[in-house]
Amino acid sequence: MKLNELRDNHGARPKSKRLGRGIGSGKGKTSGKGVKGQKAREGVSLNGFEGGQLPIYRRLPKRGFVNIFRKEYAPLNIGTLNDAIEAGRVDASQEITEDALRAAGLVRGGKVAGVRLLARGEITRAVKITVAGASAAARAAVEQAGGSITTTVVAEAAEA
């Protein structure tokens, strides 16, 4: 016996009944769907339809709003930045800007307003960083390592 000769035992897979092929077939005329009505039609399920009962999305009150002026900031942990510096993807001797972080692949997404530096991980070198924002713990960690952080968003808010 060869691989191309393998097949199921006779009767292992019952043939599916074809629908709508006469009364004698057992699945003729209405094809087991009963008589008329919504469920007899093609494409039965209607999302959110609860049989005439007021659907849950209309029973619950509306809440909140979407602020169209909200700005999203891409998070970046100092541990990730440190790994990139050690791997040679970011030059620690130069000032590290958001463009340098984007070029190194540390920041993704086109619609982010800037980068926010967060404190997870450790940083071992003195670096000079310019980002949109930084948490207090991240700022303390960078300054403890001998570096400095300049935030652009805070500077813009102070000027306004």
From Swiss-Prot:
Binds to the 23S rRNA. Residues 1-39 are annotated as: Disordered. The keyword Ribonucleoprotein applies. Residues 21-35 have a biased composition (Gly residues). Residues 1-11 have a biased composition (Basic and acidic residues). GO terms for molecular function: rRNA binding; structural constituent of ribosome. Signal peptide: none annotated. Keywords: Ribonucleoprotein, Ribosomal protein, RNA-binding, rRNA-binding. PROSITE patterns: RIBOSOMAL_L15. InterPro entries: Ribosomal_uL15, Ribosomal_uL15/eL18, Ribosomal_uL15/eL18_sf, Ribosomal_uL15_bac-type, Ribosomal_uL15_CS. Part of the 50S ribosomal subunit. The keyword Ribosomal protein applies. GO terms for biological process: translation. Belongs to the universal ribosomal protein uL15 family. This is Large ribosomal subunit protein uL15. It comes from Granulibacter bethesdensis (strain ATCC BAA-1260 / CGDNIH1). One of its GO terms (cellular component) is cytosolic large ribosomal subunit. The gene is rplO.
